[in-house]
Amino acid sequence: MAGHSKWANIKHRKAAQDAQRGKIFTKLIRELVTAAKIGGGDVAANPRLRSAVDKALSSNMTRDTINRAIERGVGGGDDTNMETKIYEGYGPGGTAVMVECLSDNANRTISQVRPSFTKCGGNLGTEGSVGYLFSKKGLILIANADEDALTEAAIEAGADDIQAQEDGSFEIYTAWEDLGSVRDGIEAAGFNIQEAEVTMIPSTTVDLDAETAPKLLKLIDMLEDCDDVQNVYHNGEISDEVAALL
């Protein structure tokens, strides 16, 4: 978990997420339906839908299930009245936390989100309280590659930045609207993309110690266990040394 790697800070949670496959599928389908409703069913012209499809495929959802969800969104089915809502708050250690929800009932959603903050020593803030600390970006992960060749391909494709990580992987940042075109350009250059998504990147991070790190992880788990929560973003940083103590 060294450095400010967004991916490194979530790797330790993959196993727990896999154990909740049914709930994950429900959330993925919601996102597919909503993305198709808002931006249409053409993956090439709808970055949000493409990201949703990629996530669904990486979670081993079948193409048939994905296509049915997209058709429901385009056709205006009963579950297309979902709205995206962002809640902002403060977590353990003074961390900034943003919670992206997809819901048809705001009262139900807030009744799930608020207690999670309270139980973990944090508190739900007002709109704009921490949002200014994050930027919406496209993020592409390449597992292993020649750095010079990848940098050239990424720049040619229109990427904003590329960062080498200690484990040999690379994180490529783009304007969120350009994620699809940059991804296509990098793939066309022959590189294998491990993951790609639109995400929220913090401008500053908060180093967590062995006392506060578990509390933040508990908060994230509680929030992601809420049915209406799609994504949780935070600026907590857990070092390798602290991670070894958890």
UniProtKB/Swiss-Prot annotation:
<dbReference type="GO" id="GO:0003677">
    <property type="term" value="F:DNA binding"/>
</dbReference>
<protein>
    <recommendedName>
        <fullName>Probable transcriptional regulatory protein HD_0596</fullName>
    </recommendedName>
</protein>
<keyword id="KW-0963">Cytoplasm</keyword>
<dbReference type="InterPro" id="IPR002876">
    <property type="entry name" value="Transcrip_reg_TACO1-like"/>
</dbReference>
<comment type="similarity">
    <text>Belongs to the TACO1 family.</text>
</comment>
<dbReference type="InterPro" id="IPR048300">
    <property type="entry name" value="TACO1_YebC-like_2nd/3rd_dom"/>
</dbReference>
<keyword id="KW-0804">Transcription</keyword>
<dbReference type="Pfam" id="PF01709">
    <property type="entry name" value="Transcrip_reg"/>
</dbReference>
<dbReference type="InterPro" id="IPR017856">
    <property type="entry name" value="Integrase-like_N"/>
</dbReference>
<dbReference type="GO" id="GO:0006355">
    <property type="term" value="P:regulation of DNA-templated transcription"/>
</dbReference>
<dbReference type="InterPro" id="IPR029072">
    <property type="entry name" value="YebC-like"/>
</dbReference>
<dbReference type="GO" id="GO:0005829">
    <property type="term" value="C:cytosol"/>
</dbReference>
<dbReference type="Pfam" id="PF20772">
    <property type="entry name" value="TACO1_YebC_N"/>
</dbReference>
<dbReference type="InterPro" id="IPR026564">
    <property type="entry name" value="Transcrip_reg_TACO1-like_dom3"/>
</dbReference>
<keyword id="KW-0238">DNA-binding</keyword>
<keyword id="KW-0805">Transcription regulation</keyword>
<dbReference type="InterPro" id="IPR049083">
    <property type="entry name" value="TACO1_YebC_N"/>
</dbReference>
